[in-house]
Regions:
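Composition-driven recognition of glycine/serine/threonine/acidic- and proline-rich low-complexity segments
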Residues: 1-162
Length: 162
């Protein structure tokens, strides 16, 4: 496992280059963009895969005003897994309408936030490469104002976007 702690979203290209050097891999442009993308992952994957996507909830548990969930983002036409994600969602920091939509489990948090026009900032905290299972990943915090609304880990296997 090769891990790079990201100090700032503005220096992430240097961090990606460090990851390539330490792990002896060469990422293609799509993989680099996946690691640094600070927009909605689901929309970005739709463009990369040239396919509409849907969210598959593997597990979703709500306890003490926190939702933990595991999801896959898959292509609607082929059912191909594009990304696997684990998230912790802090409901106390979200409006009721957004909480209700998250509980339904039909859309990713990024799409829900986009549709509800909630101002957020994605702070990428770590990127890495798992050499045993051959996937790149990133960790980030989703913030609204000074409040953390979610912590997310997204995994992208090499064949997910090809």
């Amino acid at each position: 496992m090769f891990i790079i702690n990201v100090k700032s979203n503005s220096t992430i290209l240097n961090d990606i280059l460090k990851l390539e050097k330490r792990s002896s891999i060469k990422l293609n442009s799509f993989e680099k963009i996946l690691l640094m993308n600070n927009g909605t992952t689901e929309l970005f994957l739709q463009i990369l895969s040239n396919s509409l996507t849907k969210l598959v909830i593997i597990q979703q548990i709500e306890k003490n005003n926190i939702i933990t969930r595991k999801i896959n983002i898959i292509t609607k036409d082929r059912g191909k897994i594009l990304a696997e994600a684990q998230s912790i969602i802090y409901l106390k920091n979200l409006p009721n309408k957004i909480k209700d939509e998250i509980r339904k489990g039909e859309k990713g948090i990024g799409m829900i936030i986009l549709e509800n026009k909630l101002e957020t900032y994605k702070r990428i905290t770590e990127i890495g490469y798992n050499s045993k299972e051959s996937y790149i990943y990133r960790k980030y915090k989703l913030l609204s104002g000074k409040h953390i609304i979610s912590k997310v880990i997204e995994n992208f296997k090499g064949d997910m976007i090809k």
